[in-house]
Amino acid sequence: MLFYSFFKTLIDTEVTVELKNDMSIRGILKSVDQFLNVKLENISVVDASKYPHMAAVKDLFIRGSVVRYVHMSSAYVDTILLADACRRDLANNKRQ
């Protein structure tokens, strides 16, 4: 649930989602769920010439299992806080 909480803080920011089929899609993150499925609005495909069928698409739902990476501006990430949260989450999971 750690990364679910992290991605919830990125709502209404611009992200680039790289899919397992090598397509990269840039858009505004509108929602995320516990399976890390994401909804993007105002999308654009990074290499539009390779994926012309995506030119007319403006809003997109992406299943979490097809996501390889999510890129965002480093201004949105407090790496020290995130590393600390990961350590606490790991410690809590070991106790259970």
Swiss-Prot record:
Residues 2-76 form the Sm domain. Gene3D superfamilies: 2.30.30.100. It is found in: Nucleus; Cytoplasm. The keyword Transmembrane helix does not apply. Its main location: nucleus. GO terms for molecular function: U2 snRNA binding. The keyword Nucleotidyltransferase does not apply. Belongs to the snRNP Sm proteins family. Component of the heptameric LSM1-LSM7 complex that forms a seven-membered ring structure with a donut shape. The LSm subunits are arranged in the order lsm1, lsm2, lsm3, lsm6, lsm5, lsm7 and lsm4. Component of the heptameric LSM2-LSM8 complex that forms a seven-membered ring structure with a donut shape. The LSm subunits are arranged in the order lsm8, lsm2, lsm3, lsm6, lsm5, lsm7 and lsm4. This is LSM complex subunit lsm2. It comes from Schizosaccharomyces pombe (strain 972 / ATCC 24843). The lineage of its organism: Eukaryota, Fungi, Dikarya, Ascomycota, Taphrinomycotina. The gene is lsm2.
